[in-house]
Amino acid sequence: MPHFPNLPLPEAAAAAAHAALLALALLLLLLRSARALASRCASCLKTAPRRAAAVDGGLAAASSVGAWYRAALACCGYALLAQVAALSYEVAVAGSHVAVEALLLPAVQALAWAALLALAMQARAVGWGRFPVLVRVWWVVSFVLCVGIAYDDTRHLMGDDDDDEVDYAHMVANFASAPALGFLCLVGVMGSTGVELEFTDDDSSVHEPLLLGGQRRDADEEPGCLRVTPYGDAGIVSLATLSWLSPLLSVGAQRPLELADIPLMAHKDRAKSCYKAMSSHYERQRMERPGSEPSLAWAILKSFWREAAINGAFAAVNTIVSYVGPYLISYFVDYLSGKIEFPHEGYILASVFFVAKLLETLTARQWYLGVDVMGIHVKSGLTAMVYRKGLRLSNSSRQSHTSGEIVNYMAVDVQRVGDYAWYFHDIWMLPLQIILALAILYKNVGIAMVSTLVATVLSIAASVPVAKLQEHYQDKLMASKDERMRKTSECLKNMRILKLQAWEDRYRLKLEEMRNVECKWLRWALYSQAAVTFVFWSSPIFVAVITFGTCILLGGELTAGGVLSALATFRILQEPLRNFPDLISMIAQTRVSLDRLSHFLQQEELPDDATITVPHGSTDKAININDATFSWNPSSPTPTLSGINLSVVRGMRVAVCGVIGSGKSSLLSSILGEIPKLCGQVRISGSAAYVPQTAWIQSGNIEENILFGSPMDKQRYKRVIEACSLKKDLQLLQYGDQTIIGDRGINLSGGQKQRVQLARALYQDADIYLLDDPFSAVDAHTGSELFREYILTALASKTVIYVTHQIEFLPAADLILVLKDGHITQAGKYDDLLQAGTDFNALVCAHKEAIETMEFSEDSDEDTVSSVPIKRLTPSVSNIDNLKNKVSNNEKPSSTRGIKEKKKKPEERKKKRSVQEEERERGRVSLQVYLSYMGEAYKGTLIPLIILAQTMFQVLQIASNWWMAWANPQTEGDAPKTDSVVLLVVYMSLAFGSSLFVFVRSLLVATFGLATAQKLFVKMLRCVFRAPMSFFDTTPSGRILNRVSVDQSVVDLDIAFRLGGFASTTIQLLGIVAVMSKVTWQVLILIVPMAVACMWMQRYYIASSRELTRILSVQKSPVIHLFSESIAGAATIRGFGQEKRFMKRNLYLLDCFARPLFSSLAAIEWLCLRMELLSTFVFAFCMAILVSFPPGTIEPSMAGLAVTYGLNLNARMSRWILSFCKLENRIISVERIYQYCKLPSEAPLIIENSRPSSSWPENGNIELVDLKVRYKDDLPLVLHGISCIFPGGKKIGIVGRTGSGKSTLIQALFRLIEPTGGKVIIDDVDISRIGLHDLRSRLSIIPQDPTLFEGTIRMNLDPLEECTDQEIWEALEKCQLGEVIRSKDEKLDSPVLENGDNWSVGQRQLIALGRALLKQAKILVLDEATASVDTATDNLIQKIIRSEFKDCTVCTIAHRIPTVIDSDLVLVLSDGKIAEFDTPQRLLEDKSSMFMQLVSEYSTRSSCI
């Protein structure tokens, strides 16, 4: 800083500051000019079009300027005029004898204000949205200096310094400029110029320049494209002041932010870079030390050590400068006592205080932002590693880790490891802080500081058992949370079956029981933390008492300055000591999470050599399996498949058949490499496509599911739609192939999902197609059409292996494999196997028995749809590409209707979605959310008690510090004001009393938080379980899981403590202001405008921060959903070789999540920096006032106490605003939970005054009266006035084409969908007038998709625990599973894995039949219940139903005609209307009936047998 001799210190400081700022402005101007010159030189090498683009990308002229901008210019001009007038007056009065010193200040200020005016005027010309940072800082500094000089001039006028000559001209100019400078200070804080801009492109963002305007979008970037965050390329000043974030906050202050407003992460900060770095270091350890487990912590440290080192440097500087204030307090008190060592000592001390606090503020913000960025890197990299592992898990590993657990690894464990970045440097900072504290204490209390060291070590040692206790509680808490999340995920995925079976209350109670267990461990963890808080709040007091007591016992002399210096040191040391339990707890939590993640990452993967893949065409054998044995459980004595030898020539069609549980699906899995291979070899030639038996559909639209990552080829896409019989379905769907099909394809029927799967496989144009029973879910006509168009035509030149239970599809195969008990018992062509007899003959005979039941005229073929038997079909086309002519010739003008939606405008398509966008509030969080939360537990009575406890703590703390400052002598040699014993006793009483109130407050907050969290969880859970099925159809399960996991965890562990922390910080801040104002009331002059400025900045910040947090919550759901979805479909993803694409998608979603997270964290630091800078200037003002008082005017000990508290003003001020902002951000989780607490509910489960009799329904008579159903109010009717009667005790078959309304009718019967009109009457009871539980518990259903819950066979058959073991065994025997279950070691307690993966689809269906047998309902509904079993098993199930449900009303939806041919009545639906309803015999007599056509199609398809 320049030096100006012979000037009073305030004037000299002002002149020096203006000169320095003017020099900095000129330097930046020169640098910018040089940069512009270099840019122009570089642009000469670019093409003319690029230059033209750069010109076109410029800004238009400002359309208008605001009143504030004009006022700012006027104030600058006014200040310049005042300084010029003062300078002219000095020259005019003194003439040639004028002193240089007298002209120096007005001359420098005149030059400075001229420069400021020029820069401010340039804002309109250049189009700045915000004033440059330097200009704004200049205005603020000028106002502070003006206030300081005005105070000094006031002392002159009051006669404090009679010997000094008063410069009245400068005094008048300074006073006259004060209002203008005050206004400019306010404008500088706000920053906005008020200039409204019109851009030539779509970019409407406002940028904040450093000096001469920020750079707009690069000229070569497309208009409207997302820019990379300027964080990595920002200059030093922009980085130090975090001004690079101001453009985003400016946009957020004008309108709610959207994801598109948030800049992209820099390449080095993206998930891909983090994942590559961590994964490479982790794998390197694995290779270098093959016998030992790699260290995940070491891989993280190796990947990000540079960031950790930079953060460590900032942390070290911050720690050192934070002790400057406590070190200098004793000198400051001595100065106020009259002990002046050198001239201007007071101002120099004040300047050192100010610079130290300034450095502390700047380094803290860089340090905190650095650890935030490092945490994002760690979380992104770890999440990607967990996701990649989830895609590669072997079957045994997959069984030990459910999808819910894997999601929890990502949602909880990865989060904790990332959060540890905040605590990483505390390990070495604590010893450094202790060393610095001991050095200061040695200066003040001498050798007594040894006792400080001992007391500190004892305090730290006391944490060791606490750490073990915390680790134990964390283990238990995480285990219970895993269990709850696993069961929650399972319930959400299977909510339909829970509602159909009236089990939702039972499973909800199970979840609440699990939550109670979780709360037990949570309660212990939080209450133990409250005890730890008491211990560590008491530790600094304990250390202070020991230190002062030892000093007195050793005969040392305590002074007010020494005591205040020690207290300030203890206060700083208190932070790391108070955070030490958090550090211990975080280390314990991180260690647990690292162990869990390491254990997961070490799990066995699918071996790369499970199958040997060679290029297509390199051999004529497409698939070759030699002497192979496979087992899903390698430790089982009985392998799943054994002695498998199979050779498939390229282009061959191979059919696989056999009874349920024979190993058909496992054979396909062995070719894919999914099932562990015990011996032998599997070799495939070329790429493969896999269609599983249970459809796996992503939650995107139909088009995205079919393309599956491949580029769009419109002609090929149309041919695929045609081959998969999807054209009519897409025409019927309101939004065509742009329909969002919901979580797991829930908005499509079973047949539609299967055909979308087939289309996905066909579009990939693979070499080998593995199809697992693809035709079971479609009707006979669609199945026949699919087989002809798909397998015989589109895949004519491909190698196809298809599993089927439908015998009619076997004759067309080149090779038929018959499986039984895991062995290929027969292999050959159809006719050869028929002649051989045995197992294959049994399957065919069962099929013929079913066909023989259909007695109708042989000549009916002539009157129905003609169709060539499949066996005699000779493919006339070689592959899908040859379908082109067929599609083109048959295409009608409406054929593209189903796929034309993509041409509509994005805003139109956004409205046309079957899945709701995630609800997101906008604007401020409602006060009602806070009030509702605070009143949730104990009716809010704990809130005033918490405030009272915190107030008492603050009062007692201030009292204890005041006592020590007052009771001790001011300087050495003065007599003490009280006895040393009284001194210590009073201090200990006050200090320990304050820590006791902290303990009480912590207990109250923990109690309040637990009770509130539990109430909100139960309320949300009950509302979710009572939500209508349409909510689950349109809401991905990952989105709901996000509320019950992430948001609930925030409520459990954070919200209450944020609320308590805000109250605590508010009271502490009021205490600091009270102490400072008591000593120097002049501080209130700046406190009030500072508070106004803080509130304005808080509102400016919170407008963006609130939306960033909401965007963050919304962006979290897709990450969780992709996890769940990918893990469920991992086999399909691997079967298509799509692991890389899904990994890329995961990395993209992680970046979408990281963008708002990074901006949100940076915004916090942006606000904190400005808050702390303001409070630092207030502290400096206070110091300047104190040093300006003549000696003896103020009591030194009280002034020292004010400084001691003032040292914490910046931290408390920023923490106050920050705590409120974080509370507002976190309270969004409460807001999101309340959204789910207000979900629309289904009808009541029980209506007490309208309950049916216990024996209802007695007859099972069902009457449909003008039944009309639509799925949404804005959608067309699905059922159009259905009226018919299903007589009680009769067997009703319900048939129709795909999409005819069969499943909708069943949903209306169970009231999953409430009718739009009409009614359903069962035994004279209108079902709309009784409770849902009364209705659904009296009906029974075997659904199309068999659902098993994780647990045991017993639990799946009898979840309500109403049946005896004997009754369960009888049901198992009747459904032909008794022998299978008895062969298991655990019998009825045999385990069922997630989704029933360890049981075949057919076995799952039989278990569902067992449920129906145990329920013994009078009405039974079968919704495609036998689609996944072979014909023999189908016949068996039908016999069981005829015998066991002979007196029941049985409604059967089926695509297999033999399943319904022996029904008493057949209902034929078409387009939601009744086409026919009569006995099968009468319908068959009418050759033109639709039922006759369906039977004819099925018979024709089967006529080759």
From Swiss-Prot:
Known tissue expression: Expressed in roots, leaf sheaths, leaf blades and developing seeds.
Top EC group: translocase
Skewed-composition ranges (Polar residues): 881-897
Location within or outside the cell: Membrane
Pfam families linked: ABC_membrane, ABC_tran
Region called Disordered, residue ranges: 881-919
Biased composition (Basic and acidic residues): 904-919
Annotated Gene Ontology cellular component terms: membrane
CDD domains recorded: ABC_6TM_ABCC_D1, ABC_6TM_ABCC_D2, ABCC_MRP_domain1, ABCC_MRP_domain2
Binding-site positions, ATP: 658-665, 1296-1303
Primary localization: membrane
Annotated ranges, domain ABC transmembrane type-1: 314-589, 945-1215
Molecular function as annotated in GO: ABC-type transporter activity; ATP binding; ATP hydrolysis activity; ATPase-coupled transmembrane transporter activity
Effect of a null allele: Strong reduction in seed phytic acid, and strong increase of inorganic phosphate and myo-inositol levels in seeds. Seedling lethality when homozygous.
All residue ranges annotated as the ABC transporter domain in the record: 623-846, 1262-1496
GO biological process assignments: transmembrane transport
Membrane topology: Multi-pass membrane protein
EC number: 7.-.-.-
Keywords per UniProt: ATP-binding, Membrane, Nucleotide-binding, Repeat, Translocase, Transmembrane, Transmembrane helix, Transport
Transmembrane segments: 11-31, 54-68, 71-91, 102-122, 131-151, 171-191, 313-333, 336-356, 367-387, 421-441, 447-467, 534-554, 940-960, 980-1000, 1055-1077, 1081-1103, 1149-1169, 1174-1194
Family note: Belongs to the ABC transporter superfamily. ABCC family. Conjugate transporter (TC 3.A.1.208) subfamily.
Function: ABC transporter that may affect phytic acid transport and compartmentalization. May function directly or indirectly in removing phytic acid from the cytosol or in vesicle trafficking. Required for phytic acid accumulation in developing seeds. Phytic acid is the primary storage form of phosphorus in cereal grains and other plant seeds.
Protein name: ABC transporter C family member 13
Species classification: Eukaryota, Viridiplantae, Streptophyta, Embryophyta, Tracheophyta
Protein's gene: ABCC13
